[in-house]
Swiss-Prot record:
Gene3D superfamilies: 1.10.1420.10, 6.10.140.430, DNA repair protein MutS, domain I (3.40.1170.10), MutS, connector domain (3.30.420.110), P-loop containing nucleotide triphosphate hydrolases (3.40.50.300). The keyword Nucleotide-binding applies. ATP binds at G632, P633, N634, M635, G636, G637, K638, S639. It comes from the Bacteria. This is DNA mismatch repair protein MutS. SUPFAM superfamilies: DNA repair protein MutS, domain I, DNA repair protein MutS, domain II, DNA repair protein MutS, domain III, P-loop containing nucleoside triphosphate hydrolases. Belongs to the DNA mismatch repair MutS family. This protein is involved in the repair of mismatches in DNA. It is possible that it carries out the mismatch recognition step. This protein has a weak ATPase activity. GO terms for cellular component: cytosol.
Length: 881
């Protein structure tokens, strides 16, 4: 039974459950956290799901149609931990709070306390630190697809980032953009979205997909929605007036964010237009193979893990975004490099980093201020940041005095001056406030006279009671008379049963106990009213003052956001300088000419983790030398060399110094990788099928400005099939596509292509000493002489008996090959042998067959590379069966 089924007839339920159903009816898509006292309770299917996901007890409360109602709950004070787990599991949670008192409080038939949903937490709309890792971003993305065009919008509520783009719809390009944007949640039009596209997205990107009403994506209303949000009459200043699908996607995000946050979005004040051509394209496979953000293995180290020593969380998140979207504009890159160089001179980055260490996560604090969810300690973080601004500007002064870095000068200006705001927060908030406003004692003494007076009444209650107790003992003549308090009875004077007979006439009986009587007096009652009301009035006053502070901060939100952004950028630049000094990295140069020239390059992660000195290598590719075929033994360093070339290029196009003595790079539009081997068990694809699919993507989408890394193409099938494919791929990449390519292989026959134009042979060096193989990891010009496969197997621990047997077989095979070449006609490796003549008149062709029917139905021109390969496998399977 689920909650929806029970909503038809509510009359048999308690008032509280009737209220629950009414709220749940409006939020059927979400798990409803329904506040009941000190717990958030869940019922029916919500309870079952939460119990399974959170590992909490599933119990029951009352009955529905004669069956127990499933219930599960979590303590409200520990709810954040449970919410974080649910959001990580892709769930949406509606928080329903108690917002008032029940009616008829004095009667036995008390109405339920008023409740309402105060916010909806989804994977893409998180702003709470407790629900989001320090370096994680909560990116909400909307897709608006119509015919052959697509609009894409991104909103990060926690960082006030709002971006859009619109272009021709291509499935491959969409995957690349989603991999760059790293969405936590994708919003789509429930009426227009193609289910096949959604299924493919789910396979490519791990995130939640939420379907929204068509009205949210309405093209006619989008303009007004965005103009209202930004407080403008036209969007021409943002450059998106002519992009209807981009505007529709952006408007859909505004609608969704307002609905989930239950408030306006004052910190979303502008929108940025992006072009996919602004960035070097990195598909999901390349991002994974290069281990940019996440390592391939659980205990591995990614590039981000290695170089992220940013002193602020917002700096770390900015670094992550920079690594995920390397830019192609060399003017921006040189500005970053100039700033880094200026910080390196005289060790200026060190004092800057010391100041940055004292600054909290202001970016997220400001988002919570804007949304009205900021807590007292958020304002303390903001106060500390404002206090550090003068020190940060002073630390930057030596680096900007030469004015050689325009970027540093701009960032220094954007830091601003917040002395007045700092003074306001200093006078308004106590030094160490409690976590929650409702705990009181958040507003500092002396900030508000009315609050001080209410606190005085509350805080001096103890002394008043002591004085009153002494007074009553003396006037009544009862020396053991006591004055006490509890929440049920309030304040009281307690006498034993024996003493009750001596109670003065003005004592009014309040409560009778087994061995005592409790009384109230007019004076004590007056005091009680004053004290109890002062407590609640003080809390109400604090809430009012705190909200007033938030409103003041909202008025300064634009300048505060500029300050926050400047801090994050300075942090990243100082981190670049720190890494350059620490790792001995150097500044790269850019050239308009196609090519990659790296002298003594190193793999940054491998070098940092290696216990032995790293062997640097050169990379040389240009318009006359586009292809490097790399041969040599396994474990010799071929894959590491290829990856280091890609990572050095990536770092350079992020504006960072690079692990090389020098690096000069021409334009790069995309980096491809075909490295490693693995079955795709989820789709039933073999290692070879995965390899061919990835290779197909490269051959269809690489350009003359692409950097392509290909490792062991063709190894997943028979020797001649694999060699033929590898041979053809090398020629296609070199002659038709003309990209820059590093091609590692064990097919030594491919080295014959070194005589072709633009193709060079390289090998990783190794030598044998006393029967043992020593891998030198040096890349040198020319082909390898042998693969040293048996020696590598020996290093890997293969039993000696197996190695010995393999050596015997190797000698036999080598002898057979030598005899073959001595007697064979010296034909080209791929010369086609003469075939026996076939009498075509005797060939019987079946007019109909399932295979022919299948072929006739195929629209070959519309197939993607992946679909073409799958169709080929299906045809092969039909022939065999």
């Amino acid at each position: 039974m689920n909650s929806t089924e029970t909503m038809a007839d509510l009359s048999s339920y308690t008032p509280m459950m009737q209220q629950y159903f009414k709220v749940k009816l409006e939020h059927q898509h979400a798990l409803l956290f329904y506040r009941m006292g000190d717990f958030y309770e869940l019922f029916f299917d919500d309870a079952r799901k939460a119990a399974k996901l959170l590992g909490i007890t599933l119990t029951h409360r009352g009955k529905a149609n004669g069956e127990p109602i499933p219930m599960a709950g979590v303590p409200y004070h520990a709810a954040e931990g449970y919410l974080a787990r649910l959001v990580r599991a892709g769930q949406t949670v509606a928080i329903c709070e108690q917002v008032g008192e029940g009616e008829n409080a004095g009667s036995r038939c008390k109405a339920p306390m008023e409740r309402k949903v105060v916010r909806i937490i989804t994977p893409g709309t998180i702003t709470d630190d407790a629900l989001l890792g320090s370096y994680q971003s909560s990116n909400l993305v909307a897709l608006c697809i119509q015919q052959n065009k697509i609009g894409i919008a991104l909103l990060d509520l926690s960082a006030s980032i709002f971006k859009v783009q619109q272009h021709e719809f291509k499935t491959e390009q969409l995957y690349i953009e989603l991999a760059r944007l790293m969405p936590s949640e994708i919003v789509v039009d429930e009426d227009l979205v193609d289910q096949n596209i959604l299924e493919q997205i789910k396979k490519q990107i791990e995130c939640s997909i939420t379907k929204r009403p068509n009205v949210d994506f309405n093209l006619n209303n989008a303009q007004k929605t965005l103009c209202d949000q930004f407080g403008v009459t036209t969007l021409s200043g943002f450059g998106i007036d002519h992009l209807p699908l981009a505007k529709a996607a952006a408007a859909a995000l505004i609608h969704y964010a307002k609905e989930t946050q239950k408030t306006a979005l004052p910190h979303i004040r502008s929108i940025q237009l992006e072009q996919s051509t602004d960035f070097i394209a990195l598909d999901p496979i390349t991002r994974r193979n290069l281990e940019i953000i996440d390592p391939l293995f659980e205990h591995g180290t990614s590039l981000f893990n290695l170089i992220n020593d940013c002193q602020t969380a917002m700096g770390g998140r900015l670094l992550s975004r920079i690594l995920m979207q390397p830019i192609r504009d060399t003017a921006i890159l040189d500005a970053r490099l100039d700033a880094t160089e200026q910080l390196l001179i005289g060790y200026h980055e060190s004092p800057v980093r010391l100041v940055l260490k004292e600054i909290g996560d202001i970016e997220r604090v400001l988002s919570r201020v804007a949304l009205g969810t900021a807590r007292p300690r958020d304002l303390v973080q903001l106060r500390q940041a404002c206090a550090q601004i003068p020190f940060l500007r002073h630390a930057l002064l030596p680096a900007i005095q030469t004015k050689s870095s325009k970027l540093l000068n701009e960032l220094d200006h954007e830091l601003g001056d917040f002395k007045d705001l700092h003074q306001l927060l200093l006078s308004a908030i106590v030094e160490n406030p409690p976590v929650l406003l409702r705990d009181g004692n958040v507003i500092a003494e002396g900030y508000d006279a009315e609050l001080d007076e209410l606190r005085k009444i509350r805080d001096h209650a103890g002394q008043f009671l002591v004085d009153l107790e002494i007074k009553e003992r003396e006037s009544s003549g009862i020396p053991t008379l006591k004055i006490g308090y509890n929440r049920v009875s309030g304040y009281y004077i307690e006498l034993t049963r024996a003493q009750a007979e001596q109670a003065p006439a003005y004592y009014i009986r309040r409560q009778t106990l087994k061995n005592a009587e409790r009384y109230i007096t007019p004076e004590l009652k007056s005091f009680e009213d004053k004290v109890l009301s002062s407590e609640s009035r003080a809390l109400a006053r604090e809430k009012l003052l705190f909200e007033s502070l938030l409103e003041t901060l909202k008025k300064n939100i634009a300048n505060l956001q500029m300050m926050s952004s400047a801090i994050a950028q300075i942090d990243v630049l100082a981190n670049f300088a720190h890494q350059a000094r620490l790792q001995n990295w150097n500044r790269p140069d850019f050239s308009p000419e196609i090519g990659i020239k790296i002298h003594d390059g190193r793999h940054p992660v491998v070098e940092a983790l290696s216990k032995t000195p790293y062997t640097p290598n050169d990379t040389f590719l240009d318009s006359q030398h586009r292809m490097a075929i790399i041969t040599g033994p396994n474990m010799g360093g071929k894959s590491t060399f290829m990856r280091q070339t890609a990572l050095i290029s990536l770092l350079a196009y992020c504006g960072s110094y690079v692990p090389a003595k020098s690096a000069k790079l021409g334009p790069i539009d995309r980096i491809f990788t075909r490295i490693g081997s693995a079955d795709d068990l989820s789709t039933g694809k073999s290692t070879f099928m995965v390899e061919m699919t990835e290779t197909s993507q490269i051959l269809h989408h690489a350009t003359h400005q692409s950097l392509v890394l290909m490792d062991e193409v063709g190894r997943g099938t028979s020797t001649y099939d694999g060699l033929s494919l590898a041979w053809a791929c090398v020629l296609d990449l070199t002659k038709r596509i003309k990209c820059l390519c590093l091609f590692a292989t064990h097919y030594f026959e491919l080295t014959e292509l070194g005589s072709e134009s633009a193709i060079d042979n390289y090998h990783v060096t190794a030598k044998e000493m006393n029967g043992n193989l020593i891998l030198l990891h040096k890349v040198q010009h020319g082909p390898a002489s042998q693969s040293h496969g048996l020696q590598v197997a020996k290093l890997a621990g293969i039993p000696a008996s197996v190695i010995k047997e393999a050596q015997k077989r190797l000698k036999i095979l080598e002898k057979q090959q030598q005899q073959y070449f001595q007697t064979a006609v010296q034909n080209d490796l791929f010369a086609i042998p003469e075939l026996p003549q076939i009498d075509e008149t005797k060939i019987e062709i079946k007019k109909t067959s399932p295979v022919l029917d299948h072929l006739k139905q195929l629209d070959v021109d519309s197939l993607t590379p992946r679909q073409a390969l799958e169709a080929l496998y299906q045809l092969k399977d039909q022939l065999e069966h």
